[in-house]
Amino acid sequence: MMMECNIGILLASHGEYCHGAKNSLEMIIGDCPDLLCVSVTPSMNNEDVQVHMREAYELLKKECSEVLIFTDLLCGSPNHAAVRLMMSREDITVVTGYNLAILVELVNRRNTSDLKVQELLNGIEDTLASSLRIMTKEGEWYHGN
């Protein structure tokens, strides 16, 4: 079967955060093919999370050669499920902590190139640092660079 994309993206989070991020991303850049979400709800146990993560991964793998999973928190259930899945596969990379600036840059780069995951992630720290600003009424501000 011919792969249509190099990198599938899976957003995973506690609650609806991942769906909100996807909706906002689509407002900015348009349709995001090969991007799925897994929301963890209070009624789910660890096995439920693992099953949903694996099902989303398998859907992405039908079209994509690699899968990039973004999770909201390092020690959260979505991250634990993603890391467990990653440990059993060779084609998964997990990134913990994501925001809209990161998603816009990476999805745009993914959509306009044939990069592999490691190439796509080069410079992600700079994007993250430059997207953080602390501003005051007095005009003082901090940026991560």
Task: Say what each PLM segment does.
Residues 2-145:
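N-terminal loops that bind phosphate or other acidic moieties
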